[in-house]
Amino acid sequence: MKRLIIAAIATTLTVPAFAAANDAIDKAAKEKGAVKTASGMVYRSIKNGRGKSPSASSTVEVNYRGTLTNGKEFDSSYKRNQSIKFPLSGVIPCWTEGVQMMKVGGKAKLVCPPELAYGTRGAGQDVPPNATLIFEVELLDIK
């Protein structure tokens, strides 16, 4: 019986988080030019790039800003004044998928549902479990 009560409490606490995540995804998908992919991510080009797009095995250089749905910024390469380089195969699935949709010089908004971001584990103190994340990503180069 005690386990049933604990499970009911846990379910009650997580349902609002999932509802908020769905609301943010649905709202983003309605923005002009936005595309909701089969995985559930929403992609919207802010600035079109030129040239080629990276593949899932590419190493890319980007600038980015990450926020929660309440607008709280949790990370920014712009604030550090330093772009980052990484293999697309080594980041959250939302980035692997979304950055492949970009061309060098482009800038896009990625709205990442929890299952394509950090899921139930969250990330450190700034990204809670089951958080929908919003990234503004600028693709600088493909290595």
PLM regions and their residue ranges:
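Cross-family detector of peptidyl-prolyl cis-trans isomerase
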Residues: 2-143
